[in-house]
Amino acid sequence: MTKGLYIESYGCQMNVYDSLMVEDILRPLGFAAVQRPEDADIIMVNTCHVREKAAEKLYSALGRMRMLRKEGALIVVAGCVAQAEGEAVFERAPFVDVVVGPQSIHTLPELIMKATRDAKQMNVEFPAISKFDVISTDLLVSRGVSAFVSVQEGCDKFCTFCVVPYTRGPEYSRSVEDVLAEVRKLADGGTKEVVLLGQNVNAYHGTYKGNEWDLGRLIRKVAEVEGIERIRYTTSHPRDMHSSLYDAHKHEPKLLPCVHLPVQSGSDSVLRKMNRKHSVQEYMDIIDTLKEARSDIALSSDFIVGFPGETEEDFEATMDLVRHVGFATSYSFKYSPRPGTPGAEYTNQVPEEEKSSRLHRLQHLLLTQQRLFTKSMIGKTVSVLVCGTEGSRSCSNEVFGKSEHMQPVYISVDGDPAGYRNKIFSVKVLEEGARSSLKGIICTDTISLPPPHSM
C-alpha cells in the first residue's frame, strides 16, 4: 500500500533539489508525493535559514502541520534551520518526530524507521560519507523539461552576514562521473535543460579519472550528453570566476547567456566588512570579461542594504554600480542579523527606517533596469524552450516557455499545445507581457538548438 509524503520546501534551488532527492530515497519504502499534508503519512518541512525570521517561520508552519496531520503521521524538520536549531526544535515543537540537516538527508530511511517506534530522531552531523555517495542515480525519476543537478555544496567563504558555512558545511564537489550519470538519466527521461547547482557553484573542483576539473570543463562535458540542449549554473561567487568558465561562455552554445553573480554592495568599505574577498573594481572587471565573452549576456545579482556601518555614501556607491552594470534582474534585501555570524555582533547597526528607505530606492532602480531589458527584446528573435501550458494564461492556443535569458515567454500556437512541449523554437517577440514576460509567435517551423554565437 502506498504511503503519502508531503514536503513543503522553502528557500533556494538547493532545497528544491534536496526535496526531490527525499522523494527518490523514500520511494523504495512505499512513499509517494501527495499534494495535501492531511493526506500524508510523513510531513516534511524543508527549511531555509538565509532570510529574516527563518526560525519563526518554521514554527509557524509546524503549528499548521500539527493541526492538519492525520493520526500516526510523522513530522520531519529538514534543511538549514534544522541544522542550526538542532535539539531546540524538539524543545519548541515537541510533536516533531525527526530533525535532519541538509547533509544528512540520506539517513532519512533509518531515522524514519526508528521514529515509528516512538523514539525521536535527530541527525545534524556533517558525515564523512557524502549523501551523493549513498543516493544512487537509479532512484531518479523524470524531472520534466528542466531539472536541477547539484554539483557542489557548502561554502568556505565565511561572509560575515551569512549562515551557509555553518549550516551546509565546507565546500564539497561531486565527481564528474556522478554528475554525468545523473544528467544522462535525466536526459533519458526527456529533460532538455539542466541547471548545475551549488552554494558556490563556480568553486566546483570535482575529479574525473584522477584529475581535478573546474566548472567550465564540467559544462563542456555535460554539453556532450545526448538530449541536453541547454545548460545553466547558479549561484556563483566573484572570487571563483576563472578563464575556463569565460571560455565556456564564449565557445559553448548550449551554455545559456545568463549569469547570476551576487555582489551584495558597491562599496569597498562594506565589502571588506562583509568579508567578500573582492573589490568593486574586481567585480567590474569580471562583468567586463563576461560581456566580452558573450555580448548578449544577461546579468543578475544579489544586494544587501543597511549592513552595519553602511553610510549614505556607501549606499550611493551601490546605486552607481547598478547604473554602470545594467542588470536584467536582481534580488535585494534589508540586512538582518543572523545568530552565530560575525555581523550579528557588530554594534553600528543601521536604523530600520533607513534600511527600508534605501531598499525602496534600490529596488526602484533595479525594477527600471529590468523593464528596460524586457522592452529591449521586442522585435527580436529568441530561442524558447517550451515547458507546456502550466504557466500560460487561459488561452487554449497558448504555450509557455523560457527564453535563453530565462524570461517567461507566452507563445500563440496552432493546433494542440501539448505537441509543442519540451521542444525549442525560434520565437519572434511581439510585445511585453505582465511581470516582465514576453509574448510572441513561432517564426519558423524548424525546431532549433540554441544558436552558436560569434564575437
Swiss-Prot record:
Q: How is the cofactor bound?
A: Binds 2 [4Fe-4S] clusters. One cluster is coordinated with 3 cysteines and an exchangeable S-adenosyl-L-methionine.
Q: Pfam families this protein is in?
A: Radical_SAM, UPF0004
> Where is [4Fe-4S] cluster 1 bound in this sequence?
C12, C48, C80
What top-level branch of life does the organism fall under? Bacteria
The entry lists its GO molecular-function terms as: 4 iron, 4 sulfur cluster binding; metal ion binding; N6-isopentenyladenosine methylthiotransferase activity
Q: What class of enzyme is it?
A: transferase
Keyword Glycoprotein among UniProt keywords: no
Location, primary (coarse class)? cytoplasm
Q: Which key words tag this protein in UniProt?
A: 4Fe-4S, Cytoplasm, Iron, Iron-sulfur, Metal-binding, S-adenosyl-L-methionine, Transferase, tRNA processing
Cofactor annotation: [4Fe-4S] cluster
Residues engaged in binding [4Fe-4S] cluster 2: C155, C159, C162
- InterPro entries in the record: Elp3/MiaA/NifB-like_rSAM, Methylthiotransferase, Methylthiotransferase_CS, Methylthiotransferase_N, Methylthiotransferase_N_sf, MiaB_methiolase, rSAM, rSAM_horseshoe
Q: How does it assemble?
A: Monomer.
This chain belongs to the protein called: tRNA-2-methylthio-N(6)-dimethylallyladenosine synthase
Q: Which organism is it from?
A: Anaplasma marginale (strain St. Maries)
